[in-house]
Curated annotation (Swiss-Prot):
N-terminal signal peptide: 1-29
Residue intervals annotated with topology Cytoplasmic: 257-280
Tissue note: In brain, strongly expressed in the globus pallidus/ventral pallidum complex, the substantia nigra pars reticulata and the entopeduncular nucleus (at protein level). Expressed in the external plexiform layer of the olfactory bulb (at protein level). May be weakly expressed in neocortex and striatum (at protein level). Highly expressed in brain; not detected in other tissues tested. Detected in the cingulate cortex, cortical plate and caudate putamen. In neocortex, specifically expressed in neurons of layers II/III and V.
Protein name per its UniProtKB record: Lysosome-associated membrane glycoprotein 5
Function: Plays a role in short-term synaptic plasticity in a subset of GABAergic neurons in the brain.
Upper lineage: Eukaryota, Metazoa, Chordata, Craniata, Vertebrata
Recorded GO CC terms: cytoplasmic vesicle membrane; dendrite membrane; early endosome membrane; endoplasmic reticulum-Golgi intermediate compartment membrane; endosome membrane; GABA-ergic synapse; growth cone membrane; late endosome
Extracellular side: 30-235
Membrane topology: Single-pass type I membrane protein
Any single Pfam family the record assigns to this protein: Lamp2-like_luminal
Similarity remark: Belongs to the LAMP family.
Transmembrane regions listed in the UniProt entry: 236-256
Species, as recorded: Mus musculus
Biological-process GO terms, alphabetical: presynaptic modulation of chemical synaptic transmission
Positions of glycan attachment: N35, N53, N102, N127
Length: 280
């Protein structure tokens, strides 16, 4: 009898230890997500950080706005008029996320879950003439909106929750190990579950890295979008041309000064032969 009791007690202890170990493993591998938007000097830009095991694995800074068309009744209550709701991602939003080796996700909720933005990032490898090349991109976007939310929707004909999404985007393409940066506005079209409606997502002041972050809370080297590179070239080109023009002017003045000095030191030969007798 004592042996059975001891065996049962031993089994219970083992189960308790296994449960404790399982909980500890879940806690260690748990990912925490932080909304650091209050640190941004731009009131329209949000900052989100996903950390795993105490290390940053996803960072995202951006300003987001959604242009959502919806129908309202005309004054005759017969015809329909399409209005547009402009919904901005606000500070203080609730955020979730997870990091993976080839897939990472960021999910943001605001206005009491009336709006949800889900962004899926994918890392892929491609064969090129230079060999295998890895890149990451924004692969999917889901935007859930509730037309019963009265701040942005004024007397809509249909009150419902809709999903606007875009699959296989391949947007924000960036070499692996780098962050993506773009100050210019970028638009992404999302097909809505509200028939014949297209939601426009506008991103700006973007700086994102969903993979391969080396230093905690620090972006890796930036991969700038083509629009930013063009604007940077347009800003620096006049400066470069001005420097070249200034250098040409300085060189011209130096050559003129040297030439003038050399000609001034040469003996002047008189053209009038009567003056030769005064020479010597």
């Amino acid at each position: 009898m004592d042996l059975r009791v001891r065996t049962l007690l031993g089994g219970d202890r083992l189960r308790i230890l296994l449960m404790f170990f399982h909980v500890m493993v879940q806690t260690v591998a748990e990912q925490e997500v932080e909304n650091l938007s209050g640190l941004s000097t731009n009131p329209e830009k949000d900052i989100f950080v996903v950390r795993e095991n105490g290390t940053t694995c996803l960072m995202a800074e951006f300003a987001a706005k959604f242009i959502v068309p919806y129908d309202v009744w005309a004054s005759n209550y017969v015809d329909l008029i399409t209005e547009q709701a402009e919904i901005s991602l606000t500070r203080g939003a609730e955020v979730k996320g997870h990091c993976g080796h080839n897939e990472s996700e960021l999910e943001v909720f605001w206005v009491d879950h009336a709006y949800t933005l889900r962004m899926l990032f994918v890392k892929e490898s491609h064969n090129t003439s230079k060999g295998p090349e890895a890149t990451w991109n924004l692969n999917k976007v889901h935007f859930v909106y509730d037309s019963s939310e009265k701040t942005h929707f004024k007397a809509p004909v249909k009150v419902n929750k809709y999903i606007a999404s875009s699959h296989h985007l391949s947007a924000l393409v960036t070499p692996a190990g780098m962050s993506y940066e773009c100050q210019a506005q970028q638009t992404i079209s999302l097909a809505s579950s509200d028939p014949q409606k297209t939601v426009t997502m506008i991103l700006s002041a973007v700086h994102i890295q969903p993979f391969d972050i080396i230093s905690d809370f620090v972006f890796s080297e930036e991969h700038k979008c083509p629009v930013d590179e063009q604007e940077q070239l347009e800003e620096t080109l006049p400066l470069i041309l001005g420097l070249i023009l200034g250098l040409v002017i300085v060189i011209t003045l130096v050559i003129y000064h040297i030439h003038h000095k050399m000609t001034a030191n040469q003996v002047q030969i008189p053209r009038d032969r009567s003056q030769y007798k005064h020479m010597g």
